[in-house]
């Protein structure tokens, strides 16, 4: 079995950077006050680990999945890497997807967790829960007290902070699953737009993602001084 020191997964790179330069900025996000605020590599790694523990707490098994139905934001990346660190995979859903397409993707990838922007997405998902039998958690990013709006579904609809807090006590399970990851482990299902029928899922392994990252860095000669802007939908 490969260890985290001998593998070269995207997650391994994050763990390495968090050890080597913990206080340097890894991500910037523009907040409502107009200020760009940094997330350091150490905090980035810690939040990914907490998210992974929350995925375990929500019942996501190894090989399980989460669906992300929100705009580009730091939590999108945390949810994706967190699920992968816990041995799961991630499927992104475009914000211009129809409700039927979103439900289809969540059902097809057998998502345990759906991460959504706000209550509107929740309201569109709830009537279709029977089509998504493995869905145990809907995490809402923009409403910190969202659970009070959906009291008929206790524990199903939670805020991002509640989701993170739920992972306490599951850290060792994350570490064990993280150690079992290999380059061939499935990391993502990317769905087509569905213009010619139902969306089709394309399987990508951790090796696929790592190779793409390494190739992009070398092709464009990106170094530590460069800042890249995330513009296209994740």
Predicted regions, residues:
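A short N-terminal helical cap/helix-turn-helix that marks the beginning
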Residues: 5-27, 46
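Conserved structural elements of the adenylate-forming
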Residues: 47-50, 183, 202-223
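Conserved pre-ATP/AMP-binding loop-to-beta segment of ANL
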Residues: 22-25, 140, 157-162, 168-191, ...
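Conserved AMP-binding A3 loop
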Residues: 38-42, 178-180, 187-211
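Flexible, low-complexity linker/hinge segments
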Residues: 1-9, 122, 126, 146, ...
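Conserved AMP-binding/adenylate-forming core of the ANL superfamily
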Residues: 23, 27-81, 98-103, 159-164, ...
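Conserved AMP-binding loop of ANL adenylate-forming enzymes
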Residues: 68, 208, 219-234
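Structural core segment of the AMP-binding/adenylate-forming
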Residues: 58, 85-165
